[in-house]
A protein has these predicted regions:
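Helix-rich catalytic cores of soluble enzyme domains
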Residues: 1-129
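Conserved small/polar residues in nucleotide/adenosyl-binding loops
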Residues: 131-133
Length: 133
């Protein structure tokens, strides 16, 4: 699906956000560093394909969609502290490659409550401190 989108949008100068989304412990190594390395490889592969289709196409590096898997509860953790680490890694790798980076902020709460507010605040603090677009 991604390749089809890349093909259809190539040649129009549309910036492409390349997302790496390994799930630590499932589709990537269980460690944050290992999952970040897999996500980085995914992103670099997407950038190479896009640059072959349209040399000079603007790219956005996004490892912020990576998350971990809670093996005890058998569920993906999308609002845990590990997500802030992935956002920081995304920002630093974007700076390393001199590519704009992006990420996202999520929560584990199912309601608009204090937990949701606290987790979003931690996420936004991370983004406001480190990530530039």
């Amino acid at each position: 699906m991604s390749l089809e989108i890349f093909l259809r949008s190539a040649g129009h100068g549309i910036p492409a956000t390349i997302n790496g989304e390994p799930m630590a412990g499932v589709s990537g190594p269980v460690t944050i560093a290992g999952a970040a390395a897999v996500g980085n490889a995914e992103i670099l592969a997407g950038i190479v394909v896009n640059q072959l289709l349209e040399p000079g196409r603007p790219m956005i590096y996004n490892l912020g969609l990576a998350h971990v898997f809670d093996m005890k509860a058998a569920t993906a953790v999308t609002g845990g502290p590990e997500n802030a680490l992935f956002a920081q890694i995304s920002a630093e790798m974007g700076r390393f490659y001199n590519i704009p980076s992006s990420s996202w902020v999520s929560t584990e709460s199912c309601f608009t409550d204090q937990q949701a507010g606290l987790e979003k605040m931690f996420g936004f603090h991370t983004h406001l401190s480190l990530i530039h677009i």
